[in-house]
From Swiss-Prot:
Residues 199-221 are annotated as: Disordered. Gene3D superfamilies: 2.40.160.110. Residues 199-213 have a biased composition (Low complexity). The gene is LAMP2. It is found in: Lysosome membrane; Endosome membrane; Cell membrane; Cytoplasmic vesicle, Autophagosome membrane. GO terms for cellular component: autolysosome; autophagosome membrane; azurophil granule membrane; chaperone-mediated autophagy translocation complex; extracellular exosome; extracellular space; ficolin-1-rich granule membrane; intracellular membrane-bounded organelle. Residues 401-404 are annotated as: Important for binding and subsequent lysosomal degradation of target proteins. It comes from Homo sapiens (Human). The chain crosses the membrane at residues 376-399. Disulfide bonds join C41-C79, C153-C189, C232-C265, C331-C368. Residues 193-228 are annotated as: Hinge. GO terms for molecular function: enzyme binding; ion channel inhibitor activity; protein domain specific binding; signaling adaptor activity. Residues 1-28 form the signal peptide. This is Lysosome-associated membrane glycoprotein 2.
């Protein structure tokens, strides 16, 4: 748990409670902005993270997820007046900031726009960046909410522009708060109004050493990502999640019928994002290496468990599903992607092509059995050579024995 304490701005008060940061790089924020009379004028509670793609000095591309940058400040956050609407402004490191602007109409108020600024000159976050400086991405939202209603959106919302993907979830916000009291009337976003069936989850009973109870093979689903009118990423797979939290092991089969896919495709990276009523996001990030092969580089997950807690893990240093560009990777047998000690993904009937998809169809597949063959060939050759060596030695000793026997007879 990392706590940030904010101090009052002249003319307003601001309280930011502790940030609880899971293994995934995200910010959980709760904000209470007060006016000069110490009455609440704006309330917000939300989670967000940012994924940024940038070019390196060797002309390759990297993808990073923005993480904690130290002490958070709030310069520029205001309740609003007759000339300016309310604004939430958060700074979390030199050159890193996020702003949300609100406007008001006769009977509604709007989350008008958000902007995110990041500093590629920060060598810790953006190692080997080719271009250094502060870049800003602006997004117009115009989300209209009835006055004196609290806006809620637990579902994942994704904003993608240029090389930045912004993720928001568990959002609660009310601007133009009346009489200093946050409303109990909630206005839901469209995604929260649509109920979906949750995937089946099995959790074992806690014990000193718990292991997941074996489950049936998960159903394979087909997922795709489009770039305009063209399909740029294809994936077919059955997914089984193995999660360990607080010595409790869970096995979760992903139901493809209630799982939605989104993502993005770029020249050197591709993202497949899955979400459902319990999975905020399950990201598979692919990358190009040596300009002629692709592989699974990163997996990020954040999801609700049956006990109501949120499980979040990220690993951007993986190396799975390696295949030549222009082909697909296929593995019908069960495989395990080990994301961390607490999280593994079992895949079944896997086929994936994150780059160079043509006419919405898979290209020729490289089968995972080829990897096994590559491993077995040197073993087989070594065994054969060992066998030949043994035969030569046996022949030598037999010949030597007969030679000595001839001398004894003479």
């Amino acid at each position: 748990m990392v706590c940030f304490r904010l101090f009052p701005v002249p003319g307003s008060g601001l309280v930011l409670v502790c940030l609880v940061l899971g293994a995934v790089r995200s910010y959980a924020l709760e904000l209470n902005l007060t006016d000069s009379e110490n009455a609440t004028c704006l309330y917000a509670k939300w989670q967000m993270n940012f994924t940024v793609r940038y070019e390196t000095t060797n002309k390759t591309y990297k993808t990073v997820t923005i993480s904690d940058h130290g002490t958070v400040t709030y310069n520029g956050s205001i309740c609003g007046d007759d000339q300016n609407g309310p604004k939430i402004a958060v700074q979390f490191g030199p050159g890193f900031s996020w702003i949300a602007n609100f406007t008001k109409a006769a009977s509604t108020y709007s989350i008008d726009s958000v902007s995110f600024s990041y500093n590629t000159g920060d060598n810790t976050t953006f190692p080997d960046a080719e271009d250094k400086g502060i870049l800003t991405v602006d997004e117009l939202l115009a989300i209209r909410i009835p006055l004196n209603d609290l806006f809620r959106c637990n579902s994942l919302s994704t904003l993608e522009k240029n090389d930045v993907v912004q993720h928001y979830w568990d959002v609660l916000v009310q601007a133009f708060v009346q009489n200093g009291t946050v409303s109990t009337n909630e206005f839901l976003c469209d995604k929260d109004k649509t109920s979906t069936v949750a995937p089946t989850i099995h959790t074992t009973v806690p014990s000193p050493t718990t292991t997941p109870t074996p489950k049936e093979k998960p159903e394979a689903g087909t997922y795709s990502v489009n770039n305009g009118n063209d399909t740029c990423l294809l994936a077919t797979m059955g997914l089984q999640l193995n999660i360990t939290q607080d010595k409790v092991a869970s096995v979760i089969n992903i139901n493809p019928n209630t799982t939605h896919s989104t993502g993005s495709c770029r020249s050197h990276t591709a993202l497949l994002r899955l979400n459902s009523s319990t999975i905020k996001y399950l990201d598979f990030v692919f990358a190009v290496k040596n300009e002629n092969r692709f592989y699974l580089k990163e997996v990020n997950i954040s999801m609700y468990l049956v006990n109501g807690s949120v499980f979040s893990i990220a690993n951007n240093n993986l190396s799975y599903w390696d295949a030549p560009l222009g082909s697909s990777y296929m593995c019908n047998k069960e495989q395990t992607v080990s994301v961390s000690g607490a999280f593994q993904i079992n895949t079944f009937d896997l086929r994936v092509q994150p780059f160079n998809v043509t006419q919405g169809k898979y290209s020729t597949a490289q089968d995972c059995s080829a990897d096994d063959d590559n491993f077995l060939v040197p073993i087989a050759v070594g065994a054969a050579l060992a066998g030949v060596l043994i035969l030569v030695l046996l022949a030598y000793f037999i010949g030597l024995k007969h030679h000595h026997a001839g001398y004894e007879q003479f």
